[in-house]
Regions:
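Basic, helix-initiating cap at the start of DNA-binding domains
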Residues: 1-22, 31
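HTH DNA-binding helix-turn interface
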Residues: 20-24, 37-54
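Append "Primarily bacterial transcriptional regulators
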Residues: 11, 30-35, 43, 82
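Amphipathic alpha-helical packing segments from all-alpha helical-bundle domains
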Residues: 97-140, 163-166, 170
């Protein structure tokens, strides 16, 4: 394993440990470095800020699921992934604004959702709107689920999200087709 990967993993492990006991907003780069015995220069050589480190953790751990050709059907695995490390992600998803994990995750799932949605609409703008709508809903549902005092099992959450996405997509398509049909008759 290259030295840079060892360093990144040590920093990631340190951040994850710290996030078990305090919110990300209260953790400094100095705290992360002190926890794993590295200096700030090493941190900034690899990451722009602590939010960049959070995103790297997600990319590294989540890439196996995301990069599989059947990733669309593996939403249950995605839920299991978040559930297994829920303290970390519960904390990471609380941050909003620039460089937030919430926005980063939303951007990462949009291509998956776009593939799922396909060409439901003639208009690319309508398709993009639906994808953004679904991504926002998925992120909100994930946050609510992880913040619950006793989150339901990942397989149940995955089932709920899938069913909801299908129902919303079907309702949108039906409404869209009805509107197009009415517009054509006028």
């Amino acid at each position: 394993m290259p030295d840079s990967l060892i360093t990144k993993r040590a920093l990631a492990s340190s951040l994850k440990e710290l996030m078990k006991t305090q919110p990300l907003t209260k953790i400094s780069v100095g705290d992360i470095c002190e926890k794993c015995g590295m200096n700030r220069k090493s941190f900034y050589y690899h990451f722009c800020d602590k939010y960049d480190l959070v995103n790297w953790i997600f990319d590294t751990e989540f890439s196996e699921i995301r990069n599989r050709p059947d990733h669309i059907t593996k939403f249950e695995e995605i839920c299991e992934y978040f559930y297994a490390d829920r303290e970390f992600y519960r904390n990471a998803l609380q941050i909003t604004g620039q460089n937030s994990f919430r926005d980063y995750f939303r951007m990462q799932i949009q291509p998956i959702l776009k593939e799922l949605v396909g060409n439901l609409f003639d208009s690319e703008e309508d398709t993009e709107f639906l994808v953004t709508f679904l991504a926002d809903g998925m992120v909100s549902a994930l946050i609510r689920w992880l913040n619950g005092s006793d989150p339901e099992p990942p397989e149940e959450m995955a089932r709920r999200v899938r069913r909801t996405m299908v129902a919303i997509s079907q309702a949108i398509v039906t409404t869209y087709e009805e509107e197009e049909s009415k517009a054509g008759k006028e």
